[in-house]
Amino acid sequence: MRCRSAAMWIFLALRTALGSVEVRWCTASEPEQQKCEDMSQAFREAGLQPALLCVQGTSADHCVQLIAAHEADAITLDGGAIYEAGKEHGLKPVVGEVYDQEVGTSYYAVAVVKRSSNVTINTLRGVKSCHTGINRTVGWNVPVGYLVDSGRLSVMGCDVLKAVSEYFGGSCVPGAGETRYSESLCRLCRGDTSGEGVCDKSPLERYYDYSGAFRCLAEGAGDVAFVKHSTVLENTDGRTLPSWGHMLMSRDFELLCRDGSRASVTEWQHCHLARVPAHAVVVRADTDAGLIFRLLNEGQRLFSHEGSSFQMFSSEAYGQKNLLFKDSTLELVPIATQTYEAWLGPEYLHAMKGLLCDPNRLPPYLRWCVLSTPEIQKCGDMAVAFSRQRLKPEIQCVSAESPQHCMEQIQAGHIDAVTLNGEDIHTAGKTYGLIPAAGELYAADDRSNSYFVVAVVKRDSAYAFTVDELRGKRSCHPGFGSPAGWDVPVGALIHWGYIRPRNCDVLTAVGQFFNASCVPVNNPKKYPSSLCALCVGDEQGRNKCTGNSQERYYGDSGAFRCLVEGAGDVAFVKHTTIFDNTNGHNPEPWAAHLRSQDYELLCPNGARAEAHQFAACNLAQIPSHAVMVRPDTNIFTVYGLLDKAQDLFGDDHNKNGFKMFDSSSYHGRDLLFKDATVRAVPVGERTTYQDWLGPDYVAALEGMQSQRCSGAAVGAPGASLLPLLPLAVGLLLSSL
């Protein structure tokens, strides 16, 4: 008995390793089952091996489950189903379909407009849209998914149909007539010549399918059509038979590109919304891909040409379309990199992520982390205000002791979201694996919340030096622990290897790197003397090097004054500092005569730049705050909630009973969000903490953090980096 069991085990193991002695193809309908059985018979009569068996499922999703459960082996799926099968069940694509020799195993989803219009990808809100059909790949899934993923379209509560109906100024989406939003989504549809079949997902609707969506645009019903890359060329320049297209010329239409530009309809390879992968045969990870391809390759060699007894790539005999394989398939090819991510490609993957929102799996609450009594009060009012407006998911407020405690609780799944500053975003991402879900946008002229850190010098050809020659120079800093004056420049110099602290003593290392400095601090008595050497105190010479306005070289303007008056050679300040104190903007005697053109910036690449070139020549950009969540949280639902909420509560003068970006009613500042916030914004492509913070800021931060010593930390989480240094114990520094 034991030998028989061992033999059976070996047999099953060999069967699994070799992909089994037969291939069980899963079908999703009766017609497909019939075609599969005919293909099985044709293969058998031709002597093809292994044997092909047919297993009938109820749908493509059901077939995927059967394959995962080892009750079937293979099925052909479209891109969206491949994504789900790979992500949820670990299936892999092994054989791809080829439709067009020019583009191979893919085609392209494009957005088409009339050349005479001024529509771009950034101005689609409010325009009229034409779609091939509801849930169609290029007409719905890709454009809607792309708009959501890029942050152009916000979706609350996973209600994609509602979001689209409110985003466009009317649409024709054949098949949307049975939805709650048919008034908007079917507004442009016309039906057939007798007015029948309006908004049907069938040829009864004249604007259905690729040609129909393009006709919707061509006839002026819509402003943009979401179609395939070949649609325009197939229906213009005399290539179309229907009368509506006889006079159309391809040169009268253009494509919308992802970067906001437009291009000729022939330039679809670089101007498109996404490359759409061809359908592919998927199997379990343990299935021999070579065996599957060899069987299908022998099959297509015998049964893909006219006159053969069985037609692999035709469904006409069964009264259906695209059974087992797409009817437009020219050939099947093996897939080299057998992962769903590689097959689908980044553009299509991003579009699918934008659509991955199941209302039935949406948590009823978003648990927000709060850190103080005033913040608890504001969060409670926010929860009530959101609930009254039926915003989803609802807000729950959960207290924590510190930003780091919030991060721990979010990672553990006990809390869902918290707004953090730049340094804490770095910790949340690097240590706890959190990701940004939304960010804060400050006013364009906001000089305290969004700025670049720059190194300013005098324009002097006789004494010109670069960032590589800072050693031995005299430096001016707004204050110890300030982001622009200390954390970023010192962190950058450490990261670049110019400053090399010993035994974590950054203060001494900075003092030795520069010849002399002015770095105002709260308690200069316990401080390296070289860091106060350039400070001058007040008009009477008192309060020298103190971290307040009594020191004339304190703050950004003070550090710039230190440079102006010749005390220092370089000033580390915000990019706005030069303009605040030159060209008549500062009437104080020391600044009244200054001109901005007399100052330059030191660039990290060793060059110098004009003061107005700060965006390209800076040490780092201070990032805005961001809402951080777990990676398994749907960031589009978080932003969708905040975006809908700010329409109601974002204006500080709104009459709806709550102000998202104002904390004055709670006797606090920057509660839940910074009070300077103008709007919550989507993260777009900045989906990791590194992307959000930017490489220069991360480098500076990590340069500083590399000097942390165990047991040296005394500051509370969220404080500036330098309380971790032995000589700075006890200093209370402001956060970013």
Curated annotation (Swiss-Prot):
CDD domains: PBP2_transferrin
Glycosylated sites: N118, N135, N515
Cysteine disulfide links: C26-C63, C36-C54, C130-C216, C172-C189, C186-C199, C257-C271
GO biological process, one term: iron ion transport
Source domain of life: Eukaryota
Signal peptide: 1-19
Binding site for Fe(3+) 2: Y451, H625
Stated role: Involved in iron cellular uptake. Seems to be internalized and then recycled back to the cell membrane. Binds a single atom of iron per subunit. Could also bind zinc.
Protein name as catalogued: Melanotransferrin
Lineage, highest ranks first: Eukaryota, Metazoa, Chordata, Craniata, Vertebrata
